[in-house]
Swiss-Prot record:
UniProt entry keywords in alphabetical sequence: Iron, Metal-binding
Any one GO BP annotation for this protein: iron-sulfur cluster assembly
GO terms of molecular function: 2 iron, 2 sulfur cluster binding; iron ion binding
Entries under NCBIfam families matching the protein: iron-sulfur cluster assembly accessory protein (TIGR00049), IscA (TIGR02011), PRK09502.1 (NF007049)
InterPro entries (UniProt xref): Fe-S_cluster_asmbl/transfer, FeS_biogenesis, FeS_cluster_insertion, FeS_cluster_insertion_CS, HesB-like_dom_sf, IscA_proteobacteria
Coiled coil: none
Protein name: Iron-binding protein IscA
Cofactor: Fe cation
Gene transcribed to yield this protein: iscA
Length: 107
């Protein structure tokens, strides 16, 4: 099982954690949402939960809860700039369909 990050995503997360001044890493998870069933969740982690799995890539810890891991295994977190827009992009090999707006997916 693995979760990886692109260079640009790792640099962005490191910047966020440095500016925040604390935190173990970044939580990547899923929640029920949207027209396709699931949406990604990103949040800072200060304390690990019992079922958390920790991945480290390029010096950044990515924490995934046990329930989300089955949907996220093999995902690469990227940070992209397209025109005036920028944000995290999830390259998830488990996704079967995405909604038209790109906010939710199913596996």
């Amino acid at each position: 099982m693995s979760i990886t990050m692109s260079d640009s995503a790792a640099k962005r997360v490191q910047t966020f954690l440095t500016n925040r001044g604390k935190g173990l890493g970044l939580r990547l998870g899923v929640k029920t949402s949207g027209c396709s069933g699931m949406a990604y969740v990103l949040e800072f982690v200060d304390v690990l939960n019992e079922d958390d799995v920790v991945f480290e890539d390029q010096g950044v810890k990515v924490i995934v809860d046990g329930k989300s891991l089955v949907y996220l295994d093999g995902t690469e977190l990227d940070f992209v700039k397209e025109g005036l827009n920028e944000g995290f992009k999830f390259n998830n090999p488990n996704v079967k369909n995405e909604c038209g707006c790109g906010e939710s997916f199913n596996v």
